[in-house]
């Protein structure tokens, strides 16, 4: 399962899957023992029928995550697999759903984070590792400033459309341990290590 060691707190929790699509993350969360998953997507009729009929899944189709102020349950973890939008837009919204030490596992998709110039160079495929580094620095620095701590960063085992390299990050909200300088130093170490191991 893609979450690996990041999945320890999923069991018996209420979770949100932003950009649920056919339900890849939703299915993983249920297999790990999630009590309830809110499957949020702007599309309609995409979620797999098995998940659509699972009583643990709350189907929220035709729903833009940016318009959700809160959920009726205390949310322990949010997964994000969103396209055509930057995490820098979604994180402030997601932050409003969370309590202290809630978690976020999000895909960072360089093709949707890069500026038009960088995205246009490869017809939507980001191959330049310097661009990857710049995007990771921008997105994760933004997360730090939004009071998230960075607990993990890896290359996603699955590539995006057209072979785009994507990254999985593990964030916790408002842990408040360590100075901001220490957190930025740790961020830089994590980014460099991840990029060294790109496949």
Task: Enumerate the language-model features and the residues they cover.
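Conserved class I S-adenosyl-L-methionine
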Residues: 13-21
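S-adenosyl-L-methionine
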Residues: 35-89
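Short alpha-helix
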Residues: 132-146
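A short glycine-rich, Lys/Arg-flanked "PGG" loop and its adjoining helix->strand segment in the class I
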Residues: 88-105
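Flexible, glycine-/basic-rich loop-and-beta segments that form/coincide
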Residues: 165, 169-199
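Conserved SAM-binding loop of SAM-dependent methyltransferases across substrates and taxa
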Residues: 22-33
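Single conserved hydrophobic/aromatic residue that forms the stacking wall/gate
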Residues: 1-11
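Short, glycine-/aromatic-enriched active-site segment of Class I SAM-dependent methyltransferases
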Residues: 110-127
């Amino acid at each position: 399962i893609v979450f690996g060691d990041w999945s320890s707190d999923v069991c018996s929790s209420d979770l949100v899957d932003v950009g649920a699509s056919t339900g890849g993350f939703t299915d993983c969360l249920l297999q790990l023992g999630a009590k309830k998953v809110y499957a949020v997507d702007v599309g309609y009729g995409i979620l797999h029928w098995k998940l659509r009929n699972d009583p643990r899944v709350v189907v929220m189709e035709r729903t833009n995550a940016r318009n959700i102020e809160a959920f009726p349950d205390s949310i322990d973890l949010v997964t994000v697999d969103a396209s055509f939008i930057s995490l820098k837009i979604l994180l402030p919204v997601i932050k409003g759903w969370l309590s202290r030490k809630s978690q976020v596992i999000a895909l960072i998709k360089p093709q949707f984070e890069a500026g038009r110039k960088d995205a246009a160079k490869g017809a939507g495929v980001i191959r330049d590792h310097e661009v990857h580094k710049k995007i990771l620095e921008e997105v994760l620095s933004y997360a730090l400033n939004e009071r998230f701590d960075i607990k993990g960063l890896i290359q996603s085992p699955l590539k995006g459309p057209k072979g785009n390299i994507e990254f999985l990050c593990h964030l916790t909200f408002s842990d408040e341990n360590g100075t901001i300088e220490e957190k930025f130093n740790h961020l830089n170490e994590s980014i460099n290590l991840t990029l060294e191991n790109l496949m």
